[in-house]
Amino acid sequence: MKEILCVDIGGSKYMVGVITPEGKILYSRKVLWKGEAGNPGRILGNIIQTVDEVLEKHPLCRKNPMGMTIPGLADPEKGVWRSSEFLGVFNLPVGSLFQRRYGVPLKMENDANACAYAECFFGEGRMCKDFLYLTVSNSIGGALCLNGEIYTGAWGEAGEFGMCPAEDLLEK
């Protein structure tokens, strides 16, 4: 069975999991952030430590490309985490760092875009060519699906509402 390691980074936590190509979850581990915001080295170090621990339990993942979703702006072609305002991450070359450490490619995408991709292929998005996907958590994000494809625009930011903090809005 093919196993794929995935990392989902959020504003309050990150998750490292192992899935099959069909989307079956074989393993999942959630880790809460503990004051790492503003320290990209510590953020990445904690993620790498968890990935290493998961790879010990699931060594078959070492043979396959890995996936990562990030809050904020991504450059999927270059594997760069361009920005995440509330985590204080800017221009972090995660793709090349993972490639060097693990010897396999890392496919990175903005979290809302990744969710919209999932809707296009597995969810309600299969029934329509055009839709707007919204995510509301620690921040508000979005993705546009036009003609059955995720539209990112000239700078890769189309559909992204920016890092709009939602926590303050919920308290009022």
Place the predicted regions along the sequence by residue.
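Hydrophobic "anchor" residues
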Residues: K24-I25, W81, I150-Y151
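Short glycine-rich anion-binding loops that position phosphate/pyrophosphate groups of nucleotides
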Residues: S12, P71-A74, S137-S139
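Residue-level recognition of short loop/turn positions
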Residues: M1, E22, E77-K78, N147
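Glycine-rich phosphate-binding loop and adjoining helix at the ATP-binding site
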Residues: P40-I48, D52, N64-M66, G72-D130
